[in-house]
């Protein structure tokens, strides 16, 4: 299968998920991604055992989806950047890399000698990519954040998703939700920068913020608010079918939900009525044209709700099979992991963990030549230190002295 990033080396000095998930995508695409972890502490995310109330490690195993997801396919080196003895190793890694990838705050980068000027002094042709919470410059450049703050809360999604009058704010639907969207964005930016370097010789600096990704995800509503000159009126998501009965969610007899998104109701209404066993509704004078259907949408939506409530999810799946209009079952995450469409194209990919056990991870959604991805596991902490240093020509007494000094592990 094609590996478009084969031959590209990425040096990643990052923690948690936002920026590391970009490294995972690049590794999926064939890049050699070297993950620099602190020689004693490692990636801080390795210390997490629970997230959103869920265990994030497999008990009695080295497999940890919270690490293997955003770090699969990489090699790990334990390197204490704050120690002078680590400088030569760092510079050799920079010198032999095409991309430098980080989410450290500017003040930390300056302290560790990994700011843009520091890195470019060693390798002028390197792509420098930095992920931030709010902005790469300005008064908030040194302000840290996570996707829950920068992407979800400040980026507009949280307010938009929360119904009017709600007692509690709607939280992100999953851990690292904004981080993973942001990671794909970073990977795309790096790919474009590498393409530009190939054509022009210019090594670009790539900056992406979680706030910017959040604003982009919410861009339609943000743009509409800017056009209106005021915040958009809030509406209850349950009222999504106020002007079109074929949009919105409807509950089935067994407590599941169907999502209908048929944006051309006049086109899809007749077949829908046939499929639900109520063909007479298509000829009903209240609903027999697109204009009438939209004018009487509340009444039609009430009828649709009663109809959908009369059968189970599985019965509706069978009834709607092959229907032209757009609809979907609302799935939980376990069902997503077993979704037949995703399984068919290999996006729920097998990976063998460090104990030899076959696991499954979600692959990134980009496929080349319609071939399923082949994933490899994430690295154990500092698993490849000796291997990487050997490639740099650091062996024997020099390697031993670095370990004694605590510069590497």
Label for each model-derived stretch:
Residues 1-199, 234, 380, 386-409:
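N-terminal helix-loop segment corresponding to the beta1-alpha1 unit
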Residues 58-59, 67, 233-242, 248-249, ...:
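Short Gly/Pro-enriched turn/cap motifs at secondary-structure boundaries
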Residues 176-191, 210-218, 264, 268:
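Mid-domain beta-loop-alpha active-site segment that forms a flexible
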Residues 1-9, 251-253, 335-409:
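Terminal low-complexity tails and localization/encapsulation signals of metabolic enzymes
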Residues 154, 164, 183-203, 216, ...:
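Oxidoreductase and adenylate-handling cofactor-binding alpha/beta cores
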Residues 246-323, 327:
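Aromatic-enriched alpha-helical interface/lid elements that frame and gate functional surfaces
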Residues 40, 133-135, 210-215, 254-256, ...:
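Glycine-rich beta-alpha junction loops
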Residues 170-181, 203-205, 236-247, 258-261, ...:
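A short glycine-threonine-serine/GTX helix/turn-capping micro-motif
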């Amino acid at each position: 299968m094609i590996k478009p990033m084969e031959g590209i080396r990425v040096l990643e000095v990052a923690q948690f998920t936002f920026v590391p998930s970009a490294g995972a995508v690049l590794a999926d695409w064939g890049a050699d991604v070297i993950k620099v972890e602190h020689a004693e502490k490692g990636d801080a995310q390795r210390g997490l055992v629970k997230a959103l109330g869920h265990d994030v490690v497999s008990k009695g195993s080295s497999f940890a989806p919270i690490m293997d997801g955003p770090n699969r396919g990489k090699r790990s080196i334990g390197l204490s950047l704050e120690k002078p003895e680590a400088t030569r190793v760092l510079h050799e890694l920079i010198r032999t890399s095409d991309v430098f990838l980080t989410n450290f705050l500017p003040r930390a980068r300056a302290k560790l000698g990994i700011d843009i000027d520091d890195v470019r002094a060693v390798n002028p042709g390197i792509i420098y990519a930095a992920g931030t919470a709010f902005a790469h410059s300005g008064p908030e450049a040194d302000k840290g954040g996570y996707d829950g703050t920068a992407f979800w809360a400040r980026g507009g999604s949280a307010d938009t998703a929360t119904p009017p009058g709600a007692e509690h704010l709607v939280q992100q639907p999953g851990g690292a939700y904004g981080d993973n969207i942001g990671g794909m964005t970073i990977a795309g930016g790096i790919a474009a920068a590498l393409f530009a370097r190939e054509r022009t010789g210019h090594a670009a600096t790539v900056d992406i913020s979680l706030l910017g990704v959040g604003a982009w995800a919410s861009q339609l509503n943000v743009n509409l608010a800017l056009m209106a000159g005021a915040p958009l009126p809030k509406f209850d998501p349950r009222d999504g079918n106020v002007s079109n009965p074929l949009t919105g969610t409807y509950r089935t007899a067994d407590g599941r939900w169907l999502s209908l998104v048929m944006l051309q109701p006049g086109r899809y209404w007749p077949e829908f009525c046939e499929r639900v066993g109520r063909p007479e509704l298509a000829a009903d004078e209240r609903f027999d044209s697109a204009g009438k259907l939209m004018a009487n949408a509340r009444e039609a939506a009430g009828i649709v709700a009663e109809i959908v409530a009369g059968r189970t999810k599985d019965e509706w799946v069978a009834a709607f099979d092959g229907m032209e209009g757009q609809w979907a079952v609302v799935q939980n995450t376990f069902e997503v992991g077993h979704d037949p469409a995703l399984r068919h194209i290999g996006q729920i990919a097998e990976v063998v963990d460090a104990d030899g056990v076959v696991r499954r991870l979600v692959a990134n959604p980009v496929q080349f030549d319609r071939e399923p991805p082949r994933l490899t596991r994430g690295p154990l902490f500092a698993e490849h230190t000796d291997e990487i240093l050997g490639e740099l020509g650091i062996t024997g007494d020099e390697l031993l002295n670095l370990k004694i000094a605590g510069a590497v592990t």
